[in-house]
């Protein structure tokens, strides 16, 4: 390790450029992972906050909550671990003083069931009581919405009062507006014929009705529009960047080792064992990768702090730690190719 540090200090520019490349690759990887997790969270934040384990939908809905309608006659007897959810896309706008419109996901809940009672977490205000009160995603505050505002839904003349703002109220990358199932029936135009879009539960559910089907939450989330494709795209991009980092560190160390072969031959002729030189090369790779990865992490933290709240980015430290370790391991693995060259150096080359 002494030789590795000595060399890096002596060739600051060369090794600085290598670290710079590692920083850029690592930074891009961390940012991509943060954005992937941020987008994934905006797809599923509400569902995650409900702590649901299963959902019952209409069997013909193609595992889509917005396409599912559960008729009243098909509704099973519900227990304390189940909650009806009515969901439909909608457009909201303030009743006075503004013309801007926001596309949202309207979610109707039964006030006697567990999602409304225990899982709706508010950052301000209170839960909706009655069909003309709504709770908005707290992200809509940045759009100018405030407690006490009156809003309209889908251009109707009916006004709804904003009585609260909820945390983690995102579904399909859209803000949620919570209210009653009665309001959902009005927006959906179903009348009293249909009870809800789905039945969520924090346990596994048993379905006996032939018109309904139960799904795990994992299966349901994977079927959210664009969710799986979006995550797979980011995962492939991160994987390609890891391969690129492996190639970059291998090429740089290979070239540097080739340039140092005459020096290594002299050291071998002086009795320095090949194992010591190999250890120095691997030590260099460790120092370069750890330094570059730490700098990339610092850069990511600074970028996250400077980003506007509208940019979906989430730092998951356990996953970030795993990715950092993988980056370091790949870089060290890339140093094994130059190691083969060192092991083949002939001390007699220094005497020729």
Please give the residue ranges for each predicted region:
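Short helix-to-coil transition segments within interhelical loops
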Residues: 8, 267-275, 345
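Mechanotransmission and gating elements of multispan inner-membrane complexes involved in transport
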Residues: 156-159, 165-241
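Alpha-helical transmembrane segments
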Residues: 27-53
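Short helix-loop junctions at transmembrane helix boundaries
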Residues: 279-280, 284-352
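Hydrophobic secondary-structure segments that place a key small or acidic residue at a functional site
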Residues: 102-112, 117-182
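Peri-transmembrane interface segments
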Residues: 208-262, 266-267, 278-282, 286-287
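Membrane-proximal extracellular/periplasmic loop immediately following the first transmembrane helix
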Residues: 45-110
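N-terminal Sec/SRP start-transfer signal
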Residues: 1-29, 352
